[in-house]
A protein has these predicted regions:
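Long, well-ordered alpha-helical scaffolding segments within enzyme catalytic domains
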Residues: 36-42, 132-148, 208-234
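Active-site-adjacent mobile loop/cap segments within catalytic or ligand-binding domains
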Residues: 6-9, 19-20, 105-108, 156-234
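Catalytic-core regions of hydrolytic enzymes
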Residues: 2-132, 217
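A structural motif corresponding to the C-terminal end of an alpha-helix
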Residues: 40-50, 144, 184-191, 229-230
Length: 234
């Protein structure tokens, strides 16, 4: 893909009003953290000459997203994100576009700390170009998150992580690394699309890493370098 043809669309996580999307101690709010990462990655990509957009920046729901229940509002929010991405696909060509939605995972929805951890990249089911985008992000994460990998191994000794945890959560049963799921924004967008789960918001050690400058920069480099590698290789 030619650099000048590439349209990179970064996706923020949820809304500020979405229930439960925060660490138990409320220090990390997924919607806020995701927007910070998206804005930084967007600025850096634009700085090196890539056309880059963000699907939805405000923390609050727009007038069109509002609904009688939280579920309706969430459905409207997801539809707005998909419509934004697909409008760019229609304008620039789906093969020139790519969508990277940036989230933080959670092991439970009980407002308690857990011992799960790790970085993962999700795609829709089946073999698509999204798999290639995911592979490139994983490959750069292996390099940039080496310190996180070491941190997890040490954390297993203290109980911060249980013994089954791995720094990179993958499903290699189909010959590649990406996890697969029926996420709406992956199934309904017309271009290669991935959803990146950056560690766990209900793991104390992960939250410390996510809130640190070192952690933020490592994750941003993983995503940015993965995108650039994808553009250069497809």
């Amino acid at each position: 893909m030619k650099k000048e043809d590439a349209i990179i669309i970064l996706g923020t996580a949820h809304l500020g009003s979405t229930p439960g999307k925060c660490s138990p101690d409320k220090r990390l709010r997924e919607a806020v953290w995701s927007r910070e990462i998206c804005k930084e990655v967007c600025a850096k990509l634009r700085g090196i000459g890539y056309k880059t957009e963000i699907d939805y920046e405000p923390l609050l729901a727009s007038k069109d997203m509002k609904g009688a229940t939280v579920k309706i509002e969430q459905n409207h929010e997801l539809a707005a994100r998909v419509n934004f991405v697909n409008s760019l696909c229609k304008k620039h060509g789906a093969s020139n576009c790519m969508y990277i939605s940036i989230h933080v995972n959670a092991a439970g929805a009980d407002d308690k700390w857990h011992t799960a951890g790790g970085f993962s990249v999700y795609t829709s089911k089946g073999k698509t170009k999204s798999d290639i985008l995911a592979e490139n992000i994983y490959d750069r994460a292996f390099v940039n998150l080496a310190d996180y990998s070491r941190m997890m191994e040490e954390g297993k000794k203290t109980g911060a992580y249980d013994s089954k945890q791995k720094p990179f959560r993958m499903d290699t049963s189909d010959g590649d690394k990406d996890m697969e799921a029926d996420f709406y924004v992956l199934n309904k967008t017309n271009c290669p699309a991935v959803l990146v789960e950056c560690m766990f918001q209900d793991n104390k050690a992960d939250v410390e890493f996510l809130l640190s400058d070192e952690g933020k920069h490592a994750i941003m480099r993983s995503i940015l370098e993965g995108i650039v590698s994808y553009v250069n290789n497809v």
